């Protein structure tokens, strides 16, 4: 005797009942999630207000300590110094706390993104975003090496040059946005290494608008060769800095949100000093580019405003990069000599 054929509608109804039960569980989970989210928002506001109040009181205390310090007896100086050190340590703790709290965007992020909260709430999310930023820099650096080599040795076309300069504009614009988000999330990027990306964005934009002509052709090969060298040095820096940062983070000597930079910082002194000749050569090449452009601007046949407008950013990049790197090297030598004298 054959069994009755299955009832398709009955199966559908039974599946629907299962879905209904699951949906009720989802609704309850979502309700709890929204309650926790409201609690989290209140905690964030309370924590932010408490930190703001305590930072204000710390500033007032620091002013009082500064005023009374000259009149303190010698036996009280050690206690005053200890108090000052504790206050500085407290400021560092506040910096770490604020990395997990919503904050107002700076002017640049407000102009680009509006008043969107870009603070990531977990260590995993922060580290994943930082790691993705580092990979983005690495991949784009390799692409820029290939394209600059192609434009320099294989193709001599203003169209491909324009595409290369457009890529540079997009790359530096993207870096400035991502770095601003990382700063909001606790990355400690030094001021110049952020600002020089804005200068590079402006420079690449002017290069993009420079029309083909005698002045452009005189500077073209020099610029493409410089771009190739600069991308190569950036690749070297990423490769060696990432390994050095990994070791220092494992030893607890660097912050988890520290980034690779296109320059030299004090933490690179151990193991990365071999990069200094490459960096200084690149800095002086920027100066050479600026001087070349200023000489071209004096040519009677020069009619393009882009010549001078490219020369000034190259000069600014040289001054900023050279003196920032030189200051780090000088401070490191000074601290080493001071340490040797103590020994």
Curated annotation (Swiss-Prot):
The protein's location, in the record's own words, is: Cell membrane; Nucleus envelope; Nucleus inner membrane; Endoplasmic reticulum
Q: How does it sit in the membrane?
A: Multi-pass membrane protein
Q: Where does this protein hold CoA?
A: 130, 187-188, 237, 240-241, 283, 332
User: What tissues has this protein been observed in?
Assistant: Widely expressed, with higher expression in the heart, kidneys, colon and sensory neurons of the dorsal root ganglia. Expressed in nociceptors. Highly expressed in white adipose tissue (at protein level). Highly expressed in brown adipose tissue and expressed at low levels in liver.
Q: Does the keyword Membrane apply?
A: yes
Give residue ranges on the Cytoplasmic side. 1-135, 184-190, 241-273, 327-343
Query: What does the record note about the induction of this protein?
Result: Up-regulated during adipocyte differentiation.
Q: One of this protein's GO BP terms? A: antiviral innate immune response
Query: Record's InterPro entries?
Result: TMEM120A/B (IPR012926)
Task: Name the UniProt key words of this record, in alphabetical order.
Answer: Cell membrane, Endoplasmic reticulum, Ion channel, Ion transport, Membrane, Nucleus, Transmembrane, Transmembrane helix, Transport
Cellular component (GO) terms are: endoplasmic reticulum; nuclear inner membrane; plasma membrane
**Where are the bilayer-spanning segments?**
136-156, 163-183, 191-211, 223-240, 274-294, 306-326
Give yes or no: UniProt keyword Cytoplasm.
no
What's one GO MF term for it?
A: coenzyme A binding
| Pfam hit, one | TMEM120A-B
Give the observed phenotype of the deletion mutant.
Answer: Embryonic lethality. Conditional knockout in nociceptors decreases the mechanosensitivity of nociceptors and reduces behavioral responses to painful mechanical stimuli but not to thermal or touch stimuli. Adipocyte-specific knockout induces a lipodystrophy syndrome with insulin resistance and metabolic defects. Conditional knockout in embryonic fibroblasts increases Zika infection in embryonic fibroblasts infected with Zika virus.
Q: What else is known?
A: TACAN means movement in Farsi.
Complex and partners: Homodimer. Forms heterooligomer with TMEM120B. Interacts with PKD2; TMEM120A inhibits PKD2 channel activity through the physical association of PKD2 with TMEM120A.
Which function does this protein serve? Multifunctional protein involved in mechanosensation, and plays an essential role in lipid metabolism and adipocyte differentiation. May function as a potential ion channel involved in sensing mechanical stimuli. Mediates the mechanosensitivity of the PKD2-TMEM120A channel complex through direct physical interaction. TMEM120A seems to affect mechanosensation by inhibiting PIEZO2 channels, possibly by altering cellular lipid content.
Into which family does the record put it? Belongs to the TMEM120 family.
Checking PANTHER family in the record gives: ION CHANNEL TACAN (PTHR21433:SF1), TRANSMEMBRANE PROTEIN INDUCED BY TUMOR NECROSIS FACTOR ALPHA (PTHR21433)
Q: Per the record, what about its domains? A: The transmembrane domain (TMD) has structural homology to the very long chain fatty acid elongase 7, ELOVL7, despite low sequence homology between them.
- What is the protein name stated in its UniProt record? Transmembrane protein 120A
Native source organism of the sequence? Mus musculus
Organism lineage reads as: Eukaryota, Metazoa, Chordata, Craniata, Vertebrata
